[in-house]
């Protein structure tokens, strides 16, 4: 039987399957952070259970921590409790933890790949919805709830129903200035935020293959935003080059054996997908969301849609509600929308290539007077170190931006970095839901270059026509 990549990964990890029952999968890698793990460890203690595979579980601190201080004693409230609990739980169980004093610390979906913890062919879970990021390596990776975190800690397995398979093919080459973020936003705009529900998506096509691993991670990161269980990209030479010599990647003969196996991780020719979506890369413009979900997105050269022209009553009602919240009128030109804040960071766009793209735009320029704050938050200590080695921090600071320590930051209103009421933000994060970046905050999702351009011009501009330094 010819199989898709997803089917190969799923079937190779089944440890038990009985008629009429949901299969049980073996989990190769479990990543944890301070927000969704405390109750899971409490559950283990109450039941008198141990962590089954300590060497397959790794922790970091990212969601609730401050990006301004590195001292846990200077944290307050829930953030301090969560960080101390994770530290205590990891020490008690022997789990490796990249804490706030480690330069390996970072956003869990940035830290995992750069350490080589993410490898092709693995099953990877984390108590975080954007675990799909790791699918960029040809791994079956998905987010789980806290009760499932406890189950994986105790058994290194998880009950998991089979999903449908979806292929999204992006044919041809993108135009100059078009990034992975634009590609995935365009995909979600076409499929809608529910288009992938019940599916695991495999991204393919020339435009996907041309992406770096960092770009591929951006694409898979947002698979969940189209309702998919996970996103996948088959591994290739780009994948292997990225992973070679990473701290936790195989070494020597083990590396050679691993690569031989990884080369088999691809969809068989003639395998059938349940759903197929095709996009032409040349049609993708820089993307900007106009509403309150990632599927409400258009090209920078378009105008805000008019709900009155929408035929579907549900879509129409959603658009009307979104425009009322976001404070925009139908037919508004995106290039007429000014912003109050800019956020460059998150597990979607905080890697070194993202920061380089933003710095290229901001070099020699200053943030616009109407922009109150520009936050640039690297995804890990290693990204921060590399950026500073290249002088990117100096470019951002000279432009009037704030250069911060690693963390999830303003992606979500769970820490000190958030929007004021009704402030509008150009953000490189992955969700533009109501209140996501702070109470009544208004979020527009864009690429790092587009966010940087909004910072220096004070409004959205078409990056394709900018003179870059």
Swiss-Prot record:
Query: Which keywords does the record carry?
Result: 4Fe-4S, Amino-acid biosynthesis, Branched-chain amino acid biosynthesis, Iron, Iron-sulfur, Leucine biosynthesis, Lyase, Metal-binding
Required co-factor(s) are: [4Fe-4S] cluster
> What do we know about how this protein assembles, alone or with others?
Heterodimer of LeuC and LeuD.
One Pfam family of this chain: Aconitase
> What's the family?
Belongs to the aconitase/IPM isomerase family. LeuC type 1 subfamily.
UniProt gene name = leuC
Pathway(s) this gene product operates in, as recorded in its UniProt entry: Amino-acid biosynthesis; L-leucine biosynthesis; L-leucine from 3-methyl-2-oxobutanoate: step 2/4
Q: Which PROSITE patterns match?
A: ACONITASE_1 (PS00450), ACONITASE_2 (PS01244)
Q: Which residues form a coiled coil?
A: none
Question: What Enzyme Commission number does this protein have?
Answer: 4.2.1.33
Protein name listed in UniProt: 3-isopropylmalate dehydratase large subunit
Name the SUPFAM superfamilies for this protein.
Aconitase iron-sulfur domain
Catalytic activity annotation: (2R,3S)-3-isopropylmalate = (2S)-2-isopropylmalate
UniProt keyword Amino-acid biosynthesis present? yes
Q: What class of enzyme is it?
A: lyase
Gene Ontology BP terms:
L-leucine biosynthetic process
Textual note on the cofactor: Binds 1 [4Fe-4S] cluster per subunit.
Q: Does the keyword DNA repair apply?
A: no
Domain of life the protein comes from: Bacteria
Q: Name one GO molecular function term.
A: 4 iron, 4 sulfur cluster binding
Reported function: Catalyzes the isomerization between 2-isopropylmalate and 3-isopropylmalate, via the formation of 2-isopropylmaleate.
The entry marks the following residues as binding [4Fe-4S] cluster, namely: 347, 408, 411
């Amino acid at each position: 039987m010819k199989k898709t990549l997803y089917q190969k990964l799923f079937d190779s990890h089944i440890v038990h399957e009985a008629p009429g029952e949901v299969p049980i999968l073996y989990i190769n890698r479990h990543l944890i952070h301070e927000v969704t793990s405390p109750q899971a460890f409490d559950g283990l203690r109450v039941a008198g259970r141990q962590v089954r595979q300590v060497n397959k579980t790794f922790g970091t601190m990212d969601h609730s921590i401050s990006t301004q201080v590195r001292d846990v004693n200077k944290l307050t409230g829930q953030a301090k409790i969560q960080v101390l609990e994770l530290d205590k739980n990891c020490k008690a169980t022997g789990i490796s933890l990249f804490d706030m004093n480690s330069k390996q610390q970072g956003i869990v979906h940035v830290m995992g790949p750069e350490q080589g913890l993410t490898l092709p062919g693995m099953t990877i879970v984390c108590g975080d919805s954007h675990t799909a990021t790791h699918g960029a390596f040809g791994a079956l990776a998905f987010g789980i709830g806290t009760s499932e975190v406890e189950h994986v800690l105790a058994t290194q397995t998880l009950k998991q129903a089979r999903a449908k398979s979806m292929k999204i093919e992006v044919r041809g080459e993108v135009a100059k200035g078009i990034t992975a973020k634009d590609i995935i936003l365009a995909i979600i705009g076409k499929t809608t935020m529910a288009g992938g529900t019940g599916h695991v998506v495999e991204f393919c096509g020339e435009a996907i293959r041309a992406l770096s691993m960092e770009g591929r991670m951006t694409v898979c990161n947002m698979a969940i935003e189209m309702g998919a269980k996970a996103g996948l990209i088959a591994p290739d030479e780009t994948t292997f080059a990225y992973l070679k010599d990473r701290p936790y990647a195989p070494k020597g003969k083990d590396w050679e054996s691993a690569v031989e196996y990884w080369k088999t991780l691809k969809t068989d020719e003639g395998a059938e997908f349940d759903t197929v979506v095709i996009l032409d890369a040349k049609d993708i413009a820089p993307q900007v969301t106009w509403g309150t979900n990632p599927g409400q997105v258009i090209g920078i050269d378009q105008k805000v849609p008019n709900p009155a022209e929408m035929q579907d009553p549900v879509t129409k009602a959603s658009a009307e509600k979104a425009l009322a919240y976001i404070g925009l009128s139908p037919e508004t030109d995106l290039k007429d929308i000014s912003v109050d804040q800019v956020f460059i960071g998150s597990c979607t766009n905080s890697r070194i290539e993202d920061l380089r793209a933003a710095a290229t735009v901001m070099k020699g320029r200053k943030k616009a007077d109407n922009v109150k704050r520009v936050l640039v938050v690297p995804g890990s200590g290693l990204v921060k170190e590399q950026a500073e080695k290249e002088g990117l921090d100096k470019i951002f600071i000279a432009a009037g931006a704030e250069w911060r320590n690693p963390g999830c930051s303003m992606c979500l209103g769970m820490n000190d970095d958030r929007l004021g009421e009704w402030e509008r933000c150009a953000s490189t994060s992955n969700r533009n839901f109501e209140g996501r970046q702070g109470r009544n905050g208004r979020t527009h999702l864009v690429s790092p270059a587009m966010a940087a351009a909004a910072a220096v011009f004070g409004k959205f501009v078409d990056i394709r026509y900018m003179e870059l330094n």
